[in-house]
Each structure stands twice: as C-alpha cells, then as structure tokens.
C-alpha cells in the first residue's frame, strides 16, 4: 500500500479494492472477530491482527502471506449467514457477478461458485441458476473458488427461492 493511500485503510479495505476482487463482500469486523467463526482456521489469531490493523505497512514484517486465504475462508462462512446472504443478494440483483453467456438464458444474473471447498483447487466460476451451468467469469479475477465453495448457489437459492428463473423466455 502506498503512503499516499488513506492511513485509516485496513488490510480488508486494501484487499477488497484490488481489481478482480469485486465478487467479494465486506465481512463485518464483529463476524471476523467472533471466535466461533474462526474455528478450524490455523494461526488465525496472528493473521487477525494484520487483517484488522488500521494501516497496512508491508515493511513492518507483520504480513504473513496467508491473509488472503484466511479472509477467503471467513468470507465463505459469512456468505452462508443471514447477513452475508443479504450482502450477496444485493450484489446479485445489481449484476455484480455478471450474466450467463448462454443465449437461451437471456442474460440471467449469475452467482460465484467454487468447484471445491479446498483452497488452491480452482479459481471462482460463475453459476447460472437458469441453465444450472458453471462458466469462467468475464471479469479479470483470480479469486480462489473456496472463497465461495461449491454449495453457495444452492444455499442462496434455497434461502431466496423467488429469485430462481424458469428456462422459458422471461420476455413473454
């Protein structure tokens, strides 16, 4: 982070501002700090200090290199919570994740999906609720698919069933 950037910025602000990270939503600090949400994440207490620190200073030696992974794993948990689903719902309605490239889906909004819940297996894809297919996103993103997981679209549409679209032409 350059010295010209806002000194009140956190690692999270910096990370969410990186081109290609627009699929991610902001995980609230109280959710990140809740020890229940940290269960099973190794070294999280050390990385938590870096993630929540008001100013990024890579020269301080406080960056561990795993911040992206740990934020991504907390993000995957958060988007399954009520607050997380609401945040992702807003992004879905705005079309932040893109639209289905299948012409018969009539530019149906898509959701991010990971092909695996295991970190490092694949990058994020987009899932069309109409044709039920996964595609490479048009946006320039290299986010790990584990930040969303393979079950996110199913959870999203089971909690918000009125958003699913039939395969017929919506213009008729």
Curated annotation (Swiss-Prot):
Unknown. In males lacking the Y chromosome, its strong overexpression leads to the appearance of proteinaceous star-shaped crystals in the primary spermatocytes causing meiotic drive, possibly by interfering with normal casein kinase 2 activity. One of its GO terms (cellular component) is cytoplasm. Interacts in vitro with the casein kinase 2 alpha subunit (CkII-alpha). The relevance of such interaction is however unclear in vivo. GO terms for molecular function: protein kinase regulator activity. There are multiple copies of the stellate gene in fruit fly, encoding proteins that are extremely similar, which makes their individual characterization difficult. Thus, most experiments probably do not discriminate between the different members. Probably not expressed in wild-type flies. In males lacking the Y chromosome, it is testis-specific and constitutes the main component of star-shaped crystals. This is Stellate protein CG33243. Belongs to the casein kinase 2 subunit beta family. Pfam families: CK_II_beta (PF01214). InterPro entries: Casein_kin_II_reg-sub_N, Casein_kinase_II_beta-like, Casein_kinase_II_reg-sub. Induction: In wild-type flies, it is strongly down-regulated by double-stranded RNA (dsRNA) interference mediated by Su(Ste) transcripts. In males lacking the Y chromosome, the absence of Su(Ste) locus, relieves such down-regulation, explaining why it is strongly expressed.
């Amino acid at each position: 982070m350059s010295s010209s950037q806002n000194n009140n910025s956190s690692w999270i602000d910096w990370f969410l501002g990186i081109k290609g990270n627009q699929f991610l939503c902001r995980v609230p600090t109280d959710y990140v700090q809740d020890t229940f949400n940290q269960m099973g994440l190794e070294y999280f207490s050390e990385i938590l200090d870096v993630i929540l620190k008001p100013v990024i200073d890579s020269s301080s030696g406080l960056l561990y290199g795993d911040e992206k992974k740990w934020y991504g794993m907390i993000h995957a948990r958060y988007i399954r919570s009520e607050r997380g689903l609401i945040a992702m719902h807003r992004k879905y309605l705005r079309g932040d994740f893109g639209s289905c490239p299948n012409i018969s889906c009539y530019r149906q909004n898509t959701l991010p999906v990971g092909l695996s819940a295991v970190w490092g297996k694949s990058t994020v894809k987009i899932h069309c609720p109409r044709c039920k297919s996964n595609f490479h996103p048009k946006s320039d993103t290299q986010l790990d698919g584990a930040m969303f997981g393979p079950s996110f679209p199913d959870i999203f549409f089971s909690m918000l069933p009125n958003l699913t679209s039939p395969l017929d032409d919506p213009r008729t």
